[in-house]
Amino acid sequence: SCCNAGFCRFGCTPCCY
């Protein structure tokens, strides 16, 4: 998934914070 440990991974939206 795009959300990993609260960080935004490149090319993924929306981002998790």
From Swiss-Prot:
Keyword Secreted: yes
Residues bearing the modification 4-hydroxyproline: 14
Keywords, comma-separated and alphabetical: Disulfide bond, Hydroxylation, Secreted, Toxin
Record keyword Secreted present: yes
MF GO annotations: toxin activity
Post-translational modification: Contains 3 disulfide bonds.
A cellular component term, taken from the record's GO annotations: extracellular region
Principal cellular location given in the protein's record: secreted
Compartment(s) of residence: Secreted
Annotated S-S bridges: 2-16, 3-12, 8-15
Tissue: Expressed by the venom duct.
Entry text on domains: The cysteine framework is III (CC-C-C-CC).
Family as reported in the entry's similarity comment: Belongs to the conotoxin M superfamily.
Listed name of the protein: Conotoxin tx3e
Organism: Conus textile
Lineage: Eukaryota, Metazoa, Spiralia, Lophotrochozoa, Mollusca
